[in-house]
Amino acid sequence: MTDTHCPYCSLQCGMTLSRKGPRLEVSERSFPVNEGALCRKGWTAAGLRGSRERLTTPMVRDRATGEWSAATWDEALDLVASKLADLRKIHGADTNAVFGGGGLTNEKAYQLGKFARVALGTSQIDYNGRWCMSSAASAGNQAFGVDRGLPFPLADIERTDVCVLVGSNLAETMPPAARHLDRLRENGGKVVVIDPRLTPTGERADLFLQPVPGTDLPLALGVLHLLDAAGAVDEDYIAERTTGFEDVRRSVAAWWPEMVERVSGVEAAQLRELASLLANAENVMVLTARGAEQHAQGTATVLAWLNVALALGMPGKTYAGYGCLTGQGNGQGGREHGQKADQLPGYRMIDDPAARAHVAAVWGVDPETLPGKGRSAYELLDALGTPEGPKSLLVFGSNIVVSAPNATHVTSRLADLDLLVVADMVMSETAALADVVLPVTQWAEETGTMTNLEGRVILRQAAVTPPDGVRSDLDVIAGLAARLGVVQGVSVGYSPVNRRELPGLPGPTWSTDPEEIFTELRAATKGGKADYSGITYDRIREEDGVFWPCPEGSEGTPRMFAEDFFHADGRARFIDVAHRGAAEQPTADYPLHLTTGRVLAQYQSGAQTRRIKDLPDDGAFVELHPLLADRVGAHDGDPVVVRTPRGEMKAPARVVTTIRPDTVFVPFHWVGANKLTNDALDPSSRMPEFKVCAAAVSA
Amino acid sequence: MSEPVSDQKIVIIGGGMAAARLVEGLVARGLGPQTTVLAEEQHVPYNRILLSAVLEGTHRPGALALREKQWYADRGVDLRLDSLVVDIHRDTRTVELADRTRVPYDAVVLATGAIPSLPPIRGVVRMDGSMDPRVQAFRSLDDCARLLTLLDEQGLRDNPRLPRSAVIVGGGLLGLQVSRALAVRGIETEIVEGRDHLLSSQVDASAGKVLKRSMAKLGTQVYLGARATRLTDEGLKLDNGYTLETDLVVLTAGGRPRANLARRAELTVNRGIVVDDQLRSIDDPDVYAIGDCAEHNATVTGFVSPAWEQAGVLAEVLAGNQAAAYEGHRVVARLRATDLDVCVLGEPQNETGEIVEIANPVKGTHRKLVVRDGRIVAGALVGDLSRVGLITQAFDRQTVLGEHEAGQLLLPEPSASGSGIPQLPDDAEVCACAGVSAGRIRACRSLEDVRDTTRATTGCGGCAPAVRQLLATRPDSSPLDATQLSLEGTTS
């Protein structure tokens, strides 16, 4: 029996694994986030164990013939390291790029960032978390001076008065979380859901608002307009704990309900209902998710809702405030420890000299040798194989060709690389394009920490030994680092790296033991915003996880901002934002809005869940309203074609009354949806606009 | 424009909503320090269209200011309040203020708005030239403040001197809003409208009839086809012989473009100041006009959204983008008043096309769309705003609709499914979290049995009520049904 957590979303539900012969069995375990509940993804999570599709030997593809052949680990790692070294010699260090994932453990994310900066010396590292909650992260940093998805435990939802969910379908994307909503309603609280689709989450709402995709921002401006007009803002809180309100207050004078109605398609009366609900509530919780965040104005959208929460005096108050419902399993921890292009461990910024000095000392290198800021995820992919861009890419924990926006273009960029290396457990769509595929362990076979959506650091523990031939990502990193010549400060292998090392320092080490790496991570995060230095594996086991910031000697911080925000003056900042609208508006040729999202039984690009036989894999579909179906002559179950300026896909129609008639929806777990999506980026978070673009549908 | 864009002096005459939006556009393009705003009112630019909301009491007056005074100063904008412009001297490219000072310009923008029409009612202006104290206009924040003072002197609602009744002259959008606002405050209101139905510029006679009926239900008497001719001590006399006893007369009878400055400067003025697609006067490349005072393509508008769109285009033009062009604008007029729902799209009185219409005078609803080539080109929704957001989107974006779609949009939305749980077919999914069908639940004996064998209710918990109901209504047959068991086998 091994106590661990689910391999999928950011709830990281607690579960227990036990061995039944060759099989692993999932059973319930009490953990505050899920209280023993699991969705079918969790219950069937062990199904990948023993899958015939599991890779158990490194594979090398012959570029000329396209044929795959098995290789030994030494052959594969030698090949990769020598190519990396050669490319670096010709094009410089930034020619080698690394792409990580929000599903990797903290230890892997940390080690990957270190590997890129120290072993490869490249600035070109980023990860798929950019496509997850980066807009909320950017907004949180601007408003609060820190980004922790939920600054309070998830179960606090049950004890607030009004919970506003903006662009979240948690009942399908993280089902056990919906229990907290139900309990809130049992306690007499109200749930508000804002979504272009009436989802199972929306069905739980006391008030459901159905805006045009891309207009959550003006809705927030309209709510604040009404709150200010009614004198319902918390003037004392604003004066004592915030700055910048006057400009924001004035800016919303231009967003009266009928103006908002025209832009958002939400009736003025509904907006008034929402404002009056908020004005009369003691505690209000505003939660955003991808629906609000995955936009070219995603950061501004989150800021606008943050302004509402701040104007009501909620952040820092118990059972109230603003939070982001992070998506990926380690979306939170993944962004804190250095696999993001602009960050070093502990949520330190890579252009901060003090941060560089601290982390370089932990790594045993000269801060001067650390590269600076690199490209953001989409910009990195967009540059691959171009004259100025990287010539190689190492991919860990991501299935880019399914999950990137404008996927056809991204696939063409991958094809122009000199070297594509993918570490994965199965032959994913991205792995299938690689030169070298490295078979790696999956969740139940390895140990490591994750930081869930609440900022709670939890521990996944290995329950079984991996199949023969499979190694951990940590082994891959150490193996490559050793070959690239920086083990214990001694140059070995293919290419002595021209790195000056500080005399007296031991030089970087490349452990493959998670707990050892975590100890190093604690030192690297010490004094940073996301301070893990007081967290140990034992504490995590004993305390049902530990919330950061947790400096040594601290009990951890389940609830933030009670006294101060993280800006130097201790105050939260109101930030004046304007509505620009979606980057791509409907035209005569593409008269509809397309939005994308998830279904319950699949996770992300489906690389894992589609290979679990107990999960239905019905393929993509196109959700459309009967009015639109009539207009284009579509019938439920019959194929329809969705086109955007970037591509097209065909899938069966699902005719439902729960979607706006001017909008179509396609789930993104299967190849296709992201051939359609727009790669317009948010100026601050560099989040692509997954959630809205112009589209046409034909039967 | 003859001057280089970089250091041109931009002078905006007017401090209304169009001017404020233009300033925001100029500031966003770095032109704030070159901008001077000459505003006649003493208030910073505010949201004029919410005045009736202030009157009604839903908005505090302080919430209307569009920017703080400091905001302008911080961005280098020279905002001069209480500054009345008397002349534009195009020869010297200066504007002259009432105090005879002159302000030089390279580009001057007229954003002078509209001037309320004063209907020719004898007795409104007294012998000494002052206005009868019972008469109020309703265009500015000061008008609104005066009215509020009258209504609620020192907050003493029981004060016998407070007005108890009011006559609103004008049955347009503003008249209806003011009437509702006063009624909400407990004032008995009556409306006098010269045309033969309410909202005559926006809706047809049958919709107007519905509106009149709704107003009557709300306690407001409406006099149509009647003109106020004289205000006496007995009250307001109408040309139909009625005399309306009243404490208050509010004038809301429309307005006309305020173009006197342009006329004096010998610029072409028809109904408004005539401008081209760059909002430039057709007579002088350094003079522009936006908002209610401007006439573009033979159209003057009295609405804020076209004014703002013009402001956006002009900011681009003044920043040097000569390709920016104003190509007209679709107007959506929304009545803002309690218990009175009206939305007018475009000009349903003037547009041609197929008319789709659904009315229920008993319920006080009248919904009409004018459709041409599958597109909604105009419409009026009275008394029932269902799907107003969707209809507005289709109108704004000129979406080509299906053959029957316009009609379907006007019909009531089909009510939510509300399917009776016991009727669920065996293959209907009850628990999405675990993927469990109604049949599999029916095959279970108890909630524990359901949890253990199907894992339904163990995810989000949302299906628990449905599961309980299914268990309660399951056919109380012998222990387990073999067919259902085998069904279960095939689905897992």
Descriptions of predicted regions:
Chain B
Residues 2-78, 176-202:
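Beta1-alpha1 glycine-rich phosphate/pyrophosphate-binding loop at the start
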Residues 2-11, 66-165, 237-240, 248-252, ...:
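FAD-binding core/adjacent interface of flavoenzyme oxidoreductases
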Residues 5-9, 28, 293-389, 416-438, ...:
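Mid-to-C-terminal Rossmann-like scaffold of FAD/NAD(P)H-dependent oxidoreductases
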Residues 14-17, 139-140, 169-172:
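Glycine-rich Rossmann-fold phosphate-binding loop(s) that bind the pyrophosphate
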Residues 32-34, 73-96, 103, 184-277, ...:
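A Rossmann-like FAD-binding core segment of flavoenzymes
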Residues 65, 162-167, 173-229, 307, ...:
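Rossmann-like dinucleotide-binding cores of NAD(P)H-dependent redox enzymes
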Residues 130-158, 234-237, 242-309, 400, ...:
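FAD-site-proximal beta/loop scaffold in flavoenzymes
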Residues 427-441, 452-472:
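Local cysteine-cluster metal-coordination motifs and their immediate loop/turn environment
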